[in-house]
């Protein structure tokens, strides 16, 4: 019996091969999208869950207005010990720094993830000494390090690394490996290769560390986080409050540090998952609509099977076998799509898992979808199975509600397609606006920078750049605005005309002059720019800083630095510029010719070790190649890097760009599904209504009249879908645009273009099939019937 079911199922799939192929490919895309998106979300939400007591480890950050995520990324060194002494819930607390470093081993330069810790880190994290000594933890011992087993294997193979030396590109003396320690899973935010001792600076006014704590097993986590948030630390003139405790396992997605965000933000991955679910739902409805239409066309066949003794169970098994075969083929093609996109997807999602794991997870998700699809299809199959023999054979049917499911299904698919296209179009328009708007307050088009750690080679490299025909303008000894090197914060609590309810103001300071403003083509609104002849504490503010102070006439106004009372005088105001992530409003910033920290701080801040230049349109590849060749030839041992400012700014939008590509692909898939569904339905309907079309032609109807019957129906469905899709899409995208300080407009022409484009595609998809049916000879049709 099973063999018979399989033969009948295969025969019907081949009979409607076009519809079957469309359904298989549609569901295969849906399977692949949903499986990969679900795997992606699970991967993002399980970072660092492998730690012993991972749910008790927290990262401590301070609320910071104006930062990209509302939190400061660094804390003072004394904070860890203070939390351990003050809160009984804290079992251990430590300071660490995590960054990528460059080391040379046998003349080869390698990038290693460096974890710089204090000795208290062993009370918070599971770091085990496997070989060697703990000399790397001795304070101010910068010539000893520990490496992981994985790193040791990578650098030295099977040889013991103890006693071997490596060379940091940032210091002259070699570094000795004194220990081998355990490594963590790569599925971690702190996936280290090398461990060093962090430096100590017992001053509450300097923040440069990450503070982590481990709570006791009995601690009330919610109560502690609220108590910590309400706690105020006062050390002299320094007041610290509103500390936020973020679980280690949530650091990947819960307001991560801006420079450590994933390639695609979790909220965008979630949107992709929802979109993938909609795609697979469209694909299922697409096939279910075709399947129901085929069941109707096979009504007499099913009735004859019933007359000849087929039971309800056998009819259900017959139909579900056909459906199951199609789902299995869709699953196989879906796995094939996953295999094709796996390398690209692994890089985009930053997966640290094997290919076999992805296949196993994807297969599990696809299996769940297959179960859902069978349950979804069971109702219509049971419904038609239970129809009486008389109603199946009878040709008299009530016109009202006829083909309602088909119309609802097509409308839903069109609605999803229009929504995807509209959202992707608005997103594309917004990203174009951010790259090309004049409201950035600066011109970064065709701008690049050569960055280095000293001024030794600045003049020689500047002369080389000036000699290049590809370079239009050179500005040495300036700091890049995007991804700056060395900007500092100036805090103030005291200024002229301060309102009683005003909050403290923090200003980002840039050591720059007139040539910098001219290079970036920034706008000086009033006053003058600082120069070498300016007074020591003259400062130029941006509009955001003036607004924070509450001034209407800022020129000549003064304010005092918090930690030492040093006064500063405003001599100019520049237009706001957006050099950070576009989701962040312009922050208070200022320009000084020179800025010294003063007070008890002994170091001098400099940001002059860079060269800015502007290259000619379309010459970046050539320009980059020439500069890199020169640097490798003339300065092979110097840390000199080339940075394209436009590319660095584009990294702020990397998540949005990835989401745009994903949504664009899904929009294309959904549109094709809808169009193919309409084409398949029209093909089936034309075959079902051949006799009706022939009779209409005999009674005087021409091809245009017959085309109008079908066009009118699908035009109505398209309009209904648009009435729902456009308002929903507008509401979603308007909310999404609120994340950006510079927003594009949702133009009226966008609606017209999308509607007209989809209408044309639908017209082309149904036009040929209806035209072919309308041009058949009525006599031949009647004879065949």
Set out the residue ranges of the language-model regions.
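C-terminal transmembrane helical bundles of large multi-pass transporters
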Residues: 637-718, 722-723, 733
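Mid-to-C-terminal secondary-structure elements
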Residues: 118-133, 145-264, 463-651
